[in-house]
Amino acid sequence: MEKYQAYLELRRSRYQDILYPLFFRESIYGLAYGHESFFIENIDYNNKFSLLIVKRLSTRMYQQTNFILFANDSNKKTFGGYNYNFDSQIILEGFGVVVEILFSLQLFISSLRGLESVKSYKNLQSIHSIFPFFEDKLIYLNHKSDIRIPYPIHLEILVQILRYWIKDVSFFHLIRFFFYYYSNWNSLFPPKKGISPFFSKRNLRIFLFLYNLYVWEYESIFLFLRNKSSQLQLKHFRVFFERIFFYEKRKHLVEISTKNCSYTLFFFKDTFIHYVRYQGKSILVLKNTPLLINKWKYYFLYLWQCYFDIWAGPETIYINQLSQYSFHFLGYFLSIPQNLSVVRSQMLKNSFLIKIVIKKLDTIIPIIPLMRSLAKTKFCNVMGHPISKPVWANFSDFYILDRFLRICRNFSHYYNGSAKKKSFYQIKYILRFSCIKTLARKHKSTVRTFLKKLSSEKLLEEFFTEEDLFSLIFPKTSLTLRRFYRGRIWYLDILFRNDFVNHLELKIGYDIL
């Protein structure tokens, strides 16, 4: 049993003086517990974040006591009966940068240790890198769970999570101070329409850091139990969910878990389980019986409720069978149909008919949602008929053509992973004739007259894909090469998605942070 204790050893750096490069300790205690009226001048430090500036600001806030009006500050806060501005944006950006530097390397190294093999880390950055993985793995699995990461989470829980990383007391005094005075303190992630501008706009860096810290925390616990599920068959699951001294319990798991427990959660060994997270949601795909899948479902619910104090109802997690369910993922509709093939086998004078079920991942382009997205951005009407873009009519011909070409090529590049590319021709048709109508509107002409005047066959050829150009240049080429261009092509250079795909995610119902 001692070999498990080495694995369960806490792999987290305990930073003692995380804020020492930025602040004087006396200033932190003064900020957190002092109720004196100390103010600073409103100096234009926008977009000029540096460690030296933050350190000087903290010193001024502690020493200067004169009252000064802030003419350029529209979001004034009241403290002790006066209006003041602590330049919270600069300070939070400053220690956000410091915390990122300290955490990023540690998290990167720990994530690489958790991987069995990392051959090409840069290739994993592409959005398309997940689809070849699905092609190889999903056909052998039978259940999929859609997990919506719950929020809001109380800010005090985040502070407690940071306590197990950092022992610098002044850091927690400062972060509690800002949370209390510059946020609503009830939740870090309020509803969409009520997102606090303090976190979402002015301090996006610290907002993203805290959110990623929260997600990383619950995923680290899940992965730990997943990797050691076969060795933890008789361990009580509530041992892991208690907030106080969780990591100490995890370190000494062997001694603690031997005690008698009233309820026992039996973990199971299953190598066919995969977890993918994206855009505030996650997917758990596995091959198990419905009973064991429901155990994983309630594990997540208990984890959020007992560990993070977040109420997550059963509707947070949906379980579906892959063979009977198609789901939307990163702009594609994915399904695993079962194709039945009949093979005749003959042995001497006897012949047999053997039925073989072949599973294959289908990546379908969601044409109707894409057309709705184009209609909202005024490339076509609700019926799918192309219309001109009057907003672009004042630009040059080269600019208009370049904008349409980039949109069309980005679409073709992103959806080249679909084996049924003919369904995408309607989208290309809308973009082509929307471009022509925009140019005709600019030159105050009809579409027919504009095409005759400029002989715009060349204009339309610019919108052809690689497969179309290949068939035009080499009309008598071999069938093998044509099949190559008709097949799926996943690119490893797609790091971002265009706005239309993001809008498509919103229409389907996926929350984007």
From Swiss-Prot:
A biological-process GO annotation: RNA splicing
Judging by the UniProt lineage, the source's domain of life is: Eukaryota
Q: Which UniProt keywords apply?
A: Chloroplast, mRNA processing, Plastid, RNA-binding, tRNA processing
The GO terms describing molecular function are: RNA binding
Q: Which InterPro entries match?
A: Domain_X, Maturase_MatK, Maturase_MatK_N
* One Pfam family matching this protein: MatK_N
Q: Which GO terms describe its cellular component?
A: chloroplast
Look up keyword RNA-binding and say if it applies: yes
Localization per Swiss-Prot or TrEMBL:
Plastid, Chloroplast
Q: List the disulfide bonds.
A: none
Q: What does this protein do?
A: Usually encoded in the trnK tRNA gene intron. Probably assists in splicing its own and other chloroplast group II introns.
Family membership noted in the UniProt record? Belongs to the intron maturase 2 family. MatK subfamily.
Protein known as: Maturase K
Q: Which organism is it from?
A: Phaseolus vulgaris
- Lineage of this protein's species? Eukaryota, Viridiplantae, Streptophyta, Embryophyta, Tracheophyta
